[in-house]
Amino acid sequence: LAIPLAAMRYDDLPIKSMIGILCFASISAVALPMGLAYLLHLSEPTIMAFATRAVTTPIALNIATLLHAPLMMVTLIVILSGVIGAAFSPWILKHIHDERASGLALGLAAHAIGTAQAWQRGPVTGRYAAFGMAVNGVFTANWLPLFILSLP
């Protein structure tokens, strides 16, 4: 992960757009699964497990420990979301012709599995997927526990 990110050119990154995309992706990737779990009247630990869906498994397990979510369920949710995201990405992204955009989408939505698939599409797609996954992991790992633990 570090080598492709070190080789990436950062001078042409649209920073404002990327920050907006990152914030929207992170918040929606947490809020939508949590909201669905809440609407289905699932238990609080299960809802907390769904909150970790936004990040890759190692980061999700650390967040889950802070949120007291069941670790096995977190692992299942995160890995399944990555597999499903990678499986449906060719269909969902078929009209996206910008390698940077499709890579970022794969990294944000399908984590490590999506990043591996992005590398099969090409080095630019893979770099942006790795960048999206890494930055989203750091961002979500910081705001999510603070937000959840500050709720009454």
Where are these regions (language model features)?
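Transmembrane alpha-helical segments of multi-pass membrane transport proteins and ion-pumping complexes
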Residues: L1-L5, S26-Y38, T57-L61, G82-K94, ...
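Alpha-helical membrane segments and immediately flanking helix-loop junctions
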Residues: I3-L5, T46-L71, I79-I84, D98-V135
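Entry/N-cap segments of selected transmembrane alpha helices
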Residues: M8-P33, T75-I84, G132-V138
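Membrane-helix interface "capping/anchor" motifs
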Residues: Y10-D11, I96-D98
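A short, structure-level motif marking secondary-structure boundaries and short turns
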Residues: S17-I19, P45-T46, R100-A101, L149-S150
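Helix-coil boundary and interhelical linker segments in multi-pass alpha-helical membrane proteins
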Residues: G35-T46, T65-M73, I148-P152
